[in-house]
Amino acid sequence: MEGKARITPQGEAAGTATTASVPGTTTDGMDPGVVATTSVVTTENASTSVATAGIGGPPQQVDQQETWRTNFYYNDVFTWSVADAPGSILYTVQHSPQNNPFTAVLSQMYAGWAGGMQFRFIVAGSGVFGGRLVAAVIPPGIEIGPGLEVRQFPHVVIDARSLEPVTITMPDLRPNMYHPTGDPGLVPTLVLSVYNNLINPFGGSTSAIQVTVETRPSEDFEFVMIRAPSSKTVDSVTPAGLLTTPVLTGVGTDNRWNCQIVGLQPVPGGLSTCNRHWNLNGSTYGWSSPRFTDIDHRRGASQPGGNNVLQFWYANAGSAVDNPICQVAPDGFPDMSFVPLNGPNVPTAGWVGFGAIWNSNSGAPNVTTVQAYELGFATGAPNNLQPATNTSGSQIVAKSIYAVSTGANQNPAGLFVMASGVISTPTARAITYTPQPDRIVNAPGTPAAAPVGKNVPIMFASVVRRTGDVNAEAGSDNGTQYGTGSQPLPVTIGLSLNNYSSALTPGQFFVWQLNFASGFMEIGLNVDGYFYAGTGASTTLIDLTELIDIRPVGPRPSTSTLVFNLGGATSGFSYV
């Protein structure tokens, strides 16, 4: 288009001024043709900029390249152990602005993003260890798992002996111009696997080192379409905040007993549970909401039988029809199995739980009392209590059975409902415990948690009361018993309120690192809501007394062995 050429005013040096249409200048609110000063480095302002580091300089006299684009910043850390075999995947991360602390914050202001990300790896081996890792960029759509030869993709090799950081760029492979901030869609994945075993040539007790991950955006990284401050997009949630330090250090309870969590119980044989257990889709196969309320109310019914006198209390938990979650059983109905007993052979360490109900004698626990207080599926009138073997046919009635021997020389008889996760021990001072997850009542279709290599399911152990033990704790007169739950209750509540399905895929763990005074370990959460630890065949309960803090690590393939590097963290209790 023809038009009049703009005449440069006299005295205006070339390059020191430009029209507002030039990219990189401030144009908002300017009329066409308004002159805007650009960043021009002269001998006068260059020395000033260096001396003041560009702080407080006049507008647009500071270098436009912000430090968050030029500097590497800490993003993550993972552990490399001598036990990791060649091919073991130690670290994976999908391309996202969340991989850098500054782009993660800025992404909240924009509707989309595009561009690559640079990753820098620093091995904390001080040049002593031998071994190599390979970092590879895997294109979108390729499944990451055992057998994947990552060296067939663009990669770099990281030598443990090298003291220099190693950098690799993750390009942005995308079918569209930009990624939406909430759902990035198909993106590449960065994978680090073992090339050669880690070797400590001097031996000793050190068997692992840490690799620090730092990031910065590539030169082509950019955001697009700023959002209004009042607007809000649908962002994919992350499970990182589900498991925190307070949950496992005092305020957290388990989802079966609602008692304070004191340890982690590995279950190498696997387990399956559904009641108050929720998955990452925000759904459950169970029948109870993640809340505990008083469900025992005395009805005062007595059932005489010769010299035996039993008193029964029945649960007042509503009916299955009134349960909005599931009509298998009333909300809050436990997943306990039955132990029917008739005659005098009643366990002398019968169970007391869910509110610590005991038979008192002048205000103190009656040591001659034999009692069992749990709930189970039962049918029939109070005079003819029978356990229900299935949930079809006759109506399921929730019964809280609390049998009490009202005479010192009398033998109680009747249906005792014992906890499946706890064994009633023969002596009052026994402090042994064996989990029995195979006796937990489950609904049809409930997924099971099976071991994945050395990664085995874990349950969260809590101290619960025993018969006549008012203040049950470690070392109490009646010993210590432990109940186990599949999740901390705060995690159960979080899963029930949100949908984390976009954050994790089948075959992945979301991993947290637990730091102890004597070492560290990792635990992972899968899509079914089960937690795992890399404890192998060990059944030793892990005491959480020395736990210092918990740090989220991120997604990782479930085939990658979770790090277990603890020493002396299981002292203080006796277990079997």
Swiss-Prot record:
The keyword Aminoacyl-tRNA synthetase does not apply. InterPro entries: Calicivirus_coat, Rhv-like, Viral_coat. Residues 1-31 are annotated as: Disordered. The N-terminus is blocked. Keywords: Capsid protein, Host cytoplasm, T=3 icosahedral capsid protein, Virion. Two different RNAs lead the expression of the capsid protein. One arises from the cleavage of the polyprotein translated from the genomic RNA and the other from the translation of a subgenomic RNA derived from the (-)RNA template. Capsid protein expressed from the subgenomic mRNA is produced in much larger amounts than the cleaved one. Belongs to the caliciviridae capsid protein family. Homodimerizes, then multimerizes. Binds to histo-blood group antigens at surface of target cells. This is Subgenomic capsid protein VP60. The lineage of its organism: Viruses, Riboviria, Orthornavirae, Pisuviricota, Pisoniviricetes.
